[in-house]
């Protein structure tokens, strides 16, 4: 009976331990040293804080300031006004230079005035088209892309018309000199010789024309055809008494 009582006592203690363990909760088995889990949790929290700080730093970069459409339109209008003002000043300067040129006939003055007026109208029209966003197809010299001989011939005509409208300006000869020099920089020597020969021939032709005009002016200021007054008097006296004696000789001595 004693043995049975001891076994019963052992069973009783085991049961009591099991009941106490069940009441207090499951037993947690730790695979790591004490404090190791806590350090890992702390490191995880540090990573979370760093990520949060990076996110707060990156957020202001993503925000973009949007410029109001009204402000953009005002800036565009201001640019157009400045461009128009600049073009008007250039036209005014050209008109002043043209007015200072000597020996301009009234017809030439009227033609120059009409030309300046047309340039002003074209400038205003282009500004109005740009302001209202009107897309006009490009024509004329700006639309050309010459590739054949005929294309370059037509291109040259349009370019000549574009340039020669400023030929009355005081700066026109210097402009042409610089232009010809700049556009001929890439040419070969043989091509430059051909261009030089053409300009030399043109120079000789202009000199001949000037000499011819000078001779014509001198002839107009020369002696009147027929001998003038003296010739007419000689003819009259010759008819009256002859040139050898009489009034004819006296007239010669007097003259």
From Swiss-Prot:
Chain coiled-coil ranges: 69-131
Region (Disordered): 1-107
Lineage: superkingdom: Eukaryota
UniProt KW keywords: Coiled coil, Cytoplasm, Initiation factor, Protein biosynthesis
Swiss-Prot/TrEMBL GO biological process terms: formation of cytoplasmic translation initiation complex
Location of the protein in the cell: Cytoplasm
Presence of the UniProt keyword Ribonucleoprotein in the record: no
GO cellular component: eukaryotic 43S preinitiation complex; eukaryotic 48S preinitiation complex; eukaryotic translation initiation factor 3 complex
InterPro entries assigned to the protein according to its UniProt record, in alphabetical order: eIF3-like_dom_sf, eIF3j
Compositionally biased tracts (Acidic residues): 1-16, 34-53
Residue spans of biased composition, Basic and acidic residues class: 54-95
Keyword Cytoplasm recorded: yes
GO MF term set: translation initiation factor activity
Subunit (UniProt): Component of the eukaryotic translation initiation factor 3 (eIF-3) complex, which is composed of 13 subunits: eif3a, eif3b, eif3c, eif3d, eif3e, eif3f, eif3g, eif3h, eif3i, eif3j, eif3k, eif3l and eif3m.
Family: Belongs to the eIF-3 subunit J family.
Chain's role: Component of the eukaryotic translation initiation factor 3 (eIF-3) complex, which is involved in protein synthesis of a specialized repertoire of mRNAs and, together with other initiation factors, stimulates binding of mRNA and methionyl-tRNAi to the 40S ribosome. The eIF-3 complex specifically targets and initiates translation of a subset of mRNAs involved in cell proliferation.
This protein's name: Eukaryotic translation initiation factor 3 subunit J
Organism: Xenopus laevis
């Amino acid at each position: 009976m004693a043995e049975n009582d001891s076994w019963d006592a052992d069973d009783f203690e085991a049961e009591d331990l099991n009941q106490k363990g069940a009441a207090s909760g499951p037993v947690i088995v730790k695979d790591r040293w004490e404090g190791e889990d806590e350090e890992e949790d702390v490191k995880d929290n540090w990573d979370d804080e760093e990520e949060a700080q990076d996110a707060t730093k990156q957020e202001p970069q993503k925000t973009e300031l949007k410029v109001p459409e009204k402000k953009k339109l005002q800036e565009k209008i201001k640019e157009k006004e400045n461009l128009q003002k600049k073009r008007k000043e250039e036209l005014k300067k050209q008109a002043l230079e043209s007015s200072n040129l000597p020996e301009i006939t009234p017809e030439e003055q009227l033609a120059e005035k009409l030309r300046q007026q047309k340039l002003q109208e074209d400038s205003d029209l282009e500004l109005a088209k740009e302001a209202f966003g009107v897309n006009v197809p490009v024509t004329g010299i700006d639309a050309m892309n010459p590739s054949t001989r005929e294309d370059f011939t037509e291109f040259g005509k349009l370019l000549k018309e574009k340039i020669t409208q400023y030929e009355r300006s005081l700066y026109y000869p210097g402009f042409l000199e610089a232009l010809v020099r700049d556009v001929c920089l890439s040419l070969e020597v043989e091509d430059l010789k051909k261009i030089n020969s053409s300009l030399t021939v043109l120079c000789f032709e202009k000199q001949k024309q000037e000499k011819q005009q000078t001779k014509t002016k001198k002839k107009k200021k020369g002696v009147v055809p027929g001998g003038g007054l003296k010739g007419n008097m000689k003819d009259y006296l010759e008819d009256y008494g002859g040139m050898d004696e009489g009034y004819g000789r006296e007239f010669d001595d007097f003259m």
